[in-house]
């Protein structure tokens, strides 16, 4: 079996590690928020895997076919054909990115304030758009310790799901969001059995199921590798079965469509398509372009298929595994097993002296940048935000620092540099301090907040 990447590199971008004193200056000027760092001041950028990957020669060549017609562009129909072939959903709407899809979907599905939206676990923008639409997001993730092995740690707790529907009434639930893979839980996969059971419960009570499928191809790979009965199936066939257990999807195409910009909505039912589509035109643009150029639609259509290639998926997940094993072997506490797109360091265990409301996950992001120029992001109580009713900080189930690996960008030597940076920071962990707010936005605060050392 080949050990190398299933591609050759045709173009390169220079990167460098700036001196420590320059990193200290850059972090201070960024108000101790990695989102405000200039990319030129970052050596290895693991802030996100969203839109940061490298496109293939086939995607670049497809962009030359882009039809820039305002309505009815041929590029849209090529994308629609691809989406329908993979998902079985006939009604397809492109959006400028995933949060555009979330915005229009929840604005139409949450029909009155206080309705619940249930999920195996929301990511930041999804949670934010539920709240902005007047809804209440509820996480129903299974409870497994970070250090304990479980093949599908992203699963919905179906017992709690059914209990919640019974107690609060199906009429008070706007929809169920099944997130695959489960980013906030550590990029963890969801089993086909769990997806099927969730859909059966939803149908029993007449509740809509939408997939959040930014990393659906990675989830299909994990099902193929870990779930009985799927080892001999191609990822596209696993995807088709998975989508049969839902009513529609929202997608940030910047992950498993392997593009730098774009999103999707797709539905099985014309009535649902019409309802949600009514909000697309004023927010995103006409239904056949959704805020994107035709060339972006072409690249997305190609990338959706490339992401389901078994060789690509083995490389992709294997690279994340490589970094995770280096850290775990060095005694770094991480979410285990590692997920499909990132390694999640358990910052609460890495920095036990930092209180949860001084955001150990964020404190560690600052330390990793200072130590080795590596940019990462917090996934924990900072990202979750405040209770909209009490105004108090909500303590998250995890305090993670996420090391998200862009697709087809870095080599394993880069990841060895990352591992060395984390290990060096671990040896100095008692010197790392928490943070406090210098300026706190009300919505999605982690993106634009300013901090000071605590």
Curated annotation (Swiss-Prot):
Gene3D superfamilies: Aspartate Aminotransferase, domain 1, Type I PLP-dependent aspartate aminotransferase-like (Major domain). The modification N6-(pyridoxal phosphate)lysine is found at residue 255. Belongs to the beta-eliminating lyase family. GO terms for molecular function: tryptophanase activity. It is an enzyme of class 4 (lyase). Pfam families: Beta_elim_lyase. Transmembrane segments: none annotated. It catalyses: L-tryptophan + H2O = indole + pyruvate + NH4(+). Its cofactor is pyridoxal 5'-phosphate. The gene is tnaA1. This is Tryptophanase 1. Pathway: Amino-acid degradation; L-tryptophan degradation via pyruvate pathway; indole and pyruvate from L-tryptophan: step 1/1. Its EC number is 4.1.99.1. Keywords: Lyase, Pyridoxal phosphate, Tryptophan catabolism. Homotetramer.
């Amino acid at each position: 079996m080949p050990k190398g990447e299933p591609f050759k590199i045709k173009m390169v971008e220079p990167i460098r590690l700036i001196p420590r004193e320059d990193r200290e200056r850059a972090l201070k000027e960024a108000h101790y928020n990695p989102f405000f760092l200039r990319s030129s001041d970052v050596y290895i950028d693991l802030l996100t895997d969203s839109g940061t990957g490298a496109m293939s020669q086939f995607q670049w060549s497809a962009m030359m076919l882009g039809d820039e017609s305002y309505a009815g562009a041929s590029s849209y129909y090529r994308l629609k054909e691809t989406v329908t072939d993979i998902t079985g959903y006939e009604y397809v709407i492109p959006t400028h990115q995933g949060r555009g899809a979330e915005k229009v979907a929840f604005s139409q599905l949450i029909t009155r304030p206080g309705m619940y939206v249930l999920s195996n676990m929301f990511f930041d923008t999804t949670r934010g758009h539920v709240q902005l639409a007047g809804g209440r997001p509820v996480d129903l993730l299974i409870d497994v310790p970070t250090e304990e092995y479980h093949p599908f740690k992203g699963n919905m707790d179906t017992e709690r799901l059914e209990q919640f529907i019974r107690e609060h009434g199906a009429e008070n639930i706007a929809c169920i969001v099944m997130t695959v893979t489960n980013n906030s839980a550590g990029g963890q996969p969801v089993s086909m059995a769990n997806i099927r059971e969730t859909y059966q419960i939803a149908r029993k009570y007449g509740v809509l199921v939408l997939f959040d499928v930014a990393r659906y191809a990675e989830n299909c790979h994990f099902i193929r590798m870990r779930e009985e009965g799927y080892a001999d199936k191609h990822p596209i066939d696993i995807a088709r079965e998975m989508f049969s257990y839902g009513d529609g999807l929202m997608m940030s195409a910047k992950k498993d469509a392997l593009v730098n910009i774009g999103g999707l909505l797709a539905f099985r039912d014309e009535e649902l398509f019409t309802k949600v589509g009514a909000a697309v035109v004023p927010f995103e643009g006409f239904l056949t372009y959704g805020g994107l150029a035709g060339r972006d639609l072409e690249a997305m259509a190609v990338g959706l298929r490339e992401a389901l290639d078994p060789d690509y998926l083995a490389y992709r997940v294997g690279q994340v595994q490589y970094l995770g094993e280096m850290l775990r072997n060095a005694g770094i506490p991480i979410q285990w097993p590692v997920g499909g797109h990132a390694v999640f360091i358990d910052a609460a265990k890495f920095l036990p002296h930092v209180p949860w409301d001084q955001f150990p996950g964020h404190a560690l992001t600052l330390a990793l940048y200072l130590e080795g120029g590596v940019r990462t992001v917090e996934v924990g109580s900072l990202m979750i935000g405040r209770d909209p009713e009490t105004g108090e900080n909500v303590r998250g189930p995890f305090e993670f620092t996420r090391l998200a690996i862009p697709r087809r960008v870095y080599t394993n030597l880069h990841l060895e540099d990352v591992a060395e940076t984390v290990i060096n920071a671990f040896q100095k962990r008692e010197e790392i301090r928490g943070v406090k707010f210098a300026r706190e936005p009300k919505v999605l605060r982690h993106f634009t907040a300013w901090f000071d050392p605590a």
